[in-house]
Each structure stands twice: as C-alpha cells, then as structure tokens.
C-alpha cells in the first residue's frame, strides 16, 4: 500500500520579526506527519508572487488567516489521498488548477497566496522524504536530478544597512564568505571568528550601542559611507587572520533607493533632510562598484541596480562578470520566466534562490536548473522575517547551489539553518564536499 496524504492542517504562527506567517502540517496514512513554515521579506521585489495578508487592523494588517483558511478549506481537502512523493504533480495541481491565476511572468498565486501554497509545498516535500526514508536533501536532489551533493559556502550578512537597519547606510548587506575553508565546519569557525572580531572593532570605534543587531543578526553601526562598511569587514577579516581565505559579498538592494521619476539612485535616501545632492546615474553607480571591486576582495554583488534596470545590469555583468558574480534577486524573483529573459539578455550571472518569491518547490527547482545550465551561480537565501524551519539548508545541499545566505552567526532563526548544514555534513561523512572556491560552479549542470 502506498502511503498517502490523509489530512492537512494550517495555522498562523509568528516569524522572527513578530509578524504572522503560515505553518502547515501534512499528515500521512502511516501515522506520521511533516511540517513546513514560510518566511517573509522586508525589501520585496514587485514581481514576487502574491503573499496574501488579511489587511484590517489586527496585526497591523499583516494577519494570514485568509491564507490559513485557503489551506484548510481549499488546498488541504483537494490533496488528501495524493502520494506525497509526487512533488511535481502536487505543486502543479495547486499552482495551475486550484489557484490558476497568471500574469505575463507566469503563475502568480493571486487567488490562494504564495504563502499558502508554499507552506503546503514545503511540508509535502518533507513528507515525501519521510515516505522514501531518505534525508530531505537527498529527496530534493532526486527531484532535481542532481547526482552530486555539495555543502554551500555560507555568506554571513554581518553589517546591515538599507531597509534592514535604522542607520544611514544605503546598501543593505555586507557579507563575508569563507571560500578558503576546507569544510562547512571550518567555514563556520572562520565566519564566527570574523564576526566576533568585527563586533569588537565596531564597539571600540562606535561605542557599545553600535553592536546592537539587525533583523538578520548583523551589526548596524551608524555609518553613512558604504565604503566604511567594506573597510570594517576588511579589518575584521585581517584581525581574525583570514585575509585571502574570507572574501566579501554585498547585497545592495538598489530598488529601495531608485527614483522612478528621474531614473537616479539616491545613496542618501535614509537622510531626513535629504536635498537630493547624492543622487547618481546608473552608470555612476556602476563605476562605484568597479572601484569597490578594485580595492576590496569582493566576489559577489547582489541587486546592484533597480529591478527594471536590465541594461545597466548587463553592462556591469559584461565589465566585471568574470571576476565577480552579479546576483539577481528583485530582478529575477526566482521566476523561471524572468530567469530565461536574463539568461537571454546576459543581464546577470547568478540567481538568488528564495522559495517564497515564486511559491513552490517545483518552480524553485526549475529556476535553479535553468540557471545552472546557463553557467550561472546560485545562492540559496533566507528572508529577513524567518522561522525556525530549516528547509533551505537541505535545499542548498540537495540542489548543490554552492552558496547560502541565511544571516549572521547570530539569532536562532539564522543559526537553525547553519546548524542543520553542520548536521548534514556530519551525516555525509567522507562523502561530504565543501564548495569552497568553486562556489559559483560547484557541480556540472543537471
């Protein structure tokens, strides 16, 4: 007798920012059950699939009871009796038939909500692994047709700016990547040591309150110059003794400070009495990145331009794309249609993989396979509003993304993912391979 889904239960829980989010349990005919919880972002791309919120006054409009109801009353009853190992079939059924809404970029989940569909998709994926009696990462690898498992390089977001922090810093994330480590375990050691060295440098320079942490566990010192963030990282890496072994990554989240009207980028956008004197063109911003890259060991720049500024993206990718990966997040929103366009137009050369931007495991896998076949890098990612769910840790190994960013080594909802990766590496034993310097292309495309 094949094991089937016998019940589905959704509930409203809370993310790491105290905002409601969706959690789903999927029960099986053998008496077991699996659980999935979805995250949510602060700086969201306008092309992301719909995250259904209730509106009204409860929870300041951020309740998810409609999404919960959609799972309990529409999706749940419709998937009872199905085989949880049939991920593609269940995802496509939810996305294309039960929801069925689409726009020019594909299935947009406007009816049921990407948060409702994804919570079920995650729980079904975990249930499928349980039924097959294999680890979740192996089940994901099998679904994708990936034969080689690789542990990702962690990209620790240790200095926060942009929409994640109350300082004046325009650029959102300054990250460290221990590419010179020989294992994930060693990468954690390097990351943690740089983080603690950074903390003492910031405390000494800016005072105790500058070491308060942001949504993702990074520090948010009150600095204005983006270059100062890079200087701090360089100093911390040096102090920890890892120069040459730990490189730098940035997530600029430039859509947050792009002016639609005059098509300029305002690096002073968080200043109260902003007179607009710091507005620059896309080309000037591109040159600023090139100067950063020549001065600092930067190997990854995410969302360097606005989500609709395809042409400036392509220029930067053409000019420095060999040396540095140019990652599309708001640009691509993990959407296979947008990924195809970017591959075609050589807009960027890496995908930021956020399952909740597209809303199903199957579509996420499709976006990753397309990216890898185009020779792109892939970085699996958390959201700023996270839960204790560790799905993306298994996802990054199962798809051999080569990279994962899930915050600083601080705050339990961030460490939950890193700790799961430590367990996976331990479980793989001698078969464990760490991406290291090959983080942009850790495996042959599958």
Curated annotation (Swiss-Prot):
Please name the pathway: Carbohydrate degradation; glycolysis; pyruvate from D-glyceraldehyde 3-phosphate: step 4/5
**Which residues of the sequence carry a binding annotation for Mg(2+)?**
251, 302, 329
Q: Name one GO biological process term.
A: glycolytic process
Instruction: List the PANTHER family hit by this protein, alphabetically.
Output: ENOLASE, ENOLASE 1
Q: What is its main location?
A: cytoplasm
Q: Which organism is it from?
A: Zea mays (Maize)
Which gene carries the instructions for this protein? ENO1
Known PROSITE patterns for this protein? ENOLASE
Q: Please name the HAMAP family in this protein's record.
A: Enolase
Q: Name one GO molecular function term.
A: phosphopyruvate hydratase activity
Describe, as the record does, how this protein assembles with itself and its partners: Homodimer.
- This protein is called what? Enolase 1
Q: Name the family the entry cites.
A: Belongs to the enolase family.
What is the enzyme's main class? lyase
Where, by residue number, does substrate bind?
164, 173, 302, 329, 381-384, 405
Q: Which Gene3D superfamilies does the protein's record reference?
A: Enolase-like C-terminal domain (3.20.20.120), Enolase-like, N-terminal domain (3.30.390.10)
